[in-house]
């Protein structure tokens, strides 16, 4: 009888875990569920004017790139990855210029644009990926965009903007660990975080304005798109909540027991600036090291 009860409990736990992996899933046993990003409604009136691999939104074309510097030595040879960890911020900006004339690291002018970048990029991520934007500390001790546009909007992680110390740049999609017993998660936020631009390599988002479109028109055209309808919904942008990446396919309690300290194999991991785990790319549990 005891064995039957044990099997029944295991089956119920497995069913709950499977349900938690589905969008909108989750429950009292295994909290979590899918990302909170909503569905995409196609707009048949859209016409694309951007270069290949670039995505148009409003008056801008965007490119999400790993910064791995993919290149082909010869036609008969495979593609070579020069840098799998991304690029420093200044190099990332130069890379954008190589991808398209007049392109630079993205300039974020509004909350609506920030929300679009967040939803668009996170949908393509398999694992958390910090991304450079174009904001960086200028020589006069002020934040400035690589595009040369004025800084009219910011979305820093803290209430006040950090000091524009030399060597700092802004990144987006920082990852924080949400430790849970059954289902560890990584939270990706749409806020900006200062980072050492010459010490840290990240992916990047490039931006350019197609011919005939200027940055001055960004506020008027860089709004979310909606399918045709009699009355459009309110256009007021709302701040996006964090997306939760569900990572652990197994039960941590069963896979990490038997250690010296209270029967656990977990131990502390050195963390980088802002308490992000130094090995979250390599460690399958993102927050613990067996």
UniProtKB/Swiss-Prot annotation:
GO BP term (any one): immune response
Glycosylation sites: 102
This protein's name: 30 kDa spicule matrix protein alpha
Protein role: Matrix protein of the sea urchin embryo spicule. The function of the matrix proteins is to direct crystal growth in certain orientations and inhibit growth in others.
InterPro entries: C-type_lectin-like (IPR001304), C-type_lectin-like/link_sf (IPR016186), CTDL_fold (IPR016187), DC-SIGN_domain-containing (IPR051004)
PROSITE patterns xrefs: C_TYPE_LECTIN_2
Family matches, as Gene3D superfamilies: Mannose-Binding Protein A, subunit A (3.10.100.10)
GO cellular component: external side of plasma membrane
Lineage: Eukaryota, Metazoa, Echinodermata, Eleutherozoa, Echinozoa
Native source organism of the sequence: Strongylocentrotus purpuratus (Purple sea urchin)
MF terms in GO: carbohydrate binding; pattern recognition receptor activity
Position of the signal peptide: 1-20
CDD domains named in the record: CLECT (cd00037)
Transmembrane segments: none
C-type lectin domain mapped to chain residues: 92-162
Keywords, alphabetical: Glycoprotein, Signal
């Amino acid at each position: 009888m005891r064995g039957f009860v044990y099997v029944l409990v295991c089956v119920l736990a497995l069913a709950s875990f499977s349900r938690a992996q589905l969008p909108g899933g989750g429950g009292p046993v295994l909290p979590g569920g899918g990302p909170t990003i909503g569905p995409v409604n196609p707009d048949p009136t859209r016409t694309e004017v951007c270069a290949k691999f670039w995505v148009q939104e409003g008056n801008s074309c965007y490119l999400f790139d790993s910064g791995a510097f993919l290149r082909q030595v010869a036609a008969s040879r495979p593609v070579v990855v020069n840098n799998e960890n991304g690029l420093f911020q200044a190099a990332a900006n130069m890379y954008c210029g190589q991808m398209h004339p007049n392109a630079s690291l993205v300039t974020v002018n509004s909350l609506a644009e920030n929300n679009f970048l967040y939803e668009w990029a996170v949908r393509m991520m398999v694992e958390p990926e910090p991304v450079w934007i174009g904001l960086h500390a200028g020589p006069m001790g002020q934040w400035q965009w690589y595009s040369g546009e004025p800084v009219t909007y910011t979305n820093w992680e803290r209430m006040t903007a950090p000091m524009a110390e030399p060597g700092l740049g802004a990144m987006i999609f920082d990852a924080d660990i949400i430790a849970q017993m059954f289902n560890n998660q990584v939270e990706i936020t749409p806020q900006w975080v200062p980072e050492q631009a010459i010490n840290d390599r990240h992916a990047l988002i490039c931006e350019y304005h197609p011919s005939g479109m200027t940055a001055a028109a960004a506020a008027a055209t860089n709004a979310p798109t909606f399918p045709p309808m009699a009355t459009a919904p309110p256009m007021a942008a709302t701040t996006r909540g964090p997306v939760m990446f569900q990572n652990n396919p197994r039960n941590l309690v069963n896979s990490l027991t038997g250690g010296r300290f209270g029967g656990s194999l977990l131990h502390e991991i050195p963390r980088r600036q802002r308490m992000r785990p130094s090995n979250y790319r390599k460690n399958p549990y993102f927050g613990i090291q067996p």
